[in-house]
Amino acid sequence: MIEFDNLTYLHGKPQGTGLLKANPEDFVVVEDLGFEPDGEGEHILVRILKNGCNTRFVADALAKFLKIHTREVSFAGQKDKHAVTEQWLCARVPGKEMPDLSAFQLEGCQVLQYARHKRKLRLGALKGNAFTLVLREVSNRDDVEQRLIDICVKGVPNYFGAQRFGIGGSNLQGALRWAQTNTPVRDRNKRSFWLSAARSAFFNQIVAERLKKADVNQVVDGDALQLAGRGSWFVATTEELAELQRRVNDKELMITAALPGSGEWGTQREALAFEQAAVAEETELQTLLVREKVEAARRAMLLYPQQLSWNWWDDVTVEIRFWLPAGSFATSVVRELINTTGDYAHIAE
């Protein structure tokens, strides 16, 4: 399996270096649920600004404050401990009386808003995230500037970030040990992390191989194409290639890559043969995903950061703002800009 650091670049390997996250304020994430609280219901949505504490820790503290079980507090996604993040937590608190959440105190946290809501907030139930990043000690301003311009037009590979695989790739290593020994894994969290890492690594490898082609965004017979922003896909046929290519060029359609698992991958003919060849050597992990009944899925091959803008504070410091849909990684954008100094595998999705 290709290591994350060796995955193919869309815009070529960056010429310069830089520092990501010199301090937490250099990595700001604002969660976008895509909806507002209902104003009624047995749940309470709580918007929290936090710095220096992870999502699970805050959720447990909120449960203790409300005198409810930790399983009654949910969230749409994990946010990084080493960043300034704004996100929603959801607590199930039936009854007409509204707790005074302004009294909730936790170092590094501030309650910004809270309101009643009818439904539980489930993992993944968000529209996306807005990012404000500061890159420091940038060694090649001209190269970064040109890459930002190119990304506006061509996007970046929609790779799963290094953090998906754990510190030092520990989640992927765990999946491989599991596949090789066939020993039952009782810990549900480990099972989830390991299976997710395996499937994500397959996706990254397929995309990396596709990016080696001369025309990355060229539709081929049997490609699975996705309407931009949608989850469903359809298969390209030879007769439609010219029209489908026009729609891909207009960013109306996205070429997808496989998240292998049980069931059909979604591609056919030439595209399917390419994907199967890209991961043909990884038989043990493929067998594991099928055995554990992890359903195959699709994910867009490229990612187009929305509302992308930047401002150079000086010749070596740039602030970058953009919005990404849920499940995408800011570090996959940064990877196309600079060779980062330091390890960012701990950054949450």
From Swiss-Prot:
Species per Swiss-Prot/TrEMBL record: Escherichia coli O127:H6 (strain E2348/69 / EPEC)
Could you tell me the gene encoding this protein? truD
This molecule's function is given as: Responsible for synthesis of pseudouridine from uracil-13 in transfer RNAs.
Location of the active site: D80 (nucleophile)
Q: What is its EC number?
A: 5.4.99.27
Q: Which GO cellular component terms, listed alphabetically, does the Swiss-Prot or TrEMBL entry include?
A: cytosol
| Coiled-coil regions, chain positions | none
The chain positions of domain TRUD read 155-303
Name of this chain's protein: tRNA pseudouridine synthase D
Q: Quickly give the catalysed reaction.
A: uridine(13) in tRNA = pseudouridine(13) in tRNA
The UniProt annotation places substrate binding at: F27, N129, F329
User: HAMAP family from the entry?
Assistant: TruD
* GO BP terms, alphabetized: tRNA pseudouridine synthesis
**Protein family membership:** Belongs to the pseudouridine synthase TruD family.
Its keywords, alphabetically, are: Isomerase, tRNA processing
Return the Pfam families for the record.
Answer: TruD
Q: Which PROSITE patterns match?
A: TRUD, UPF0024
Domain of life, source organism: Bacteria
Gene Ontology molecular-function annotations = RNA binding; tRNA pseudouridine(13) synthase activity
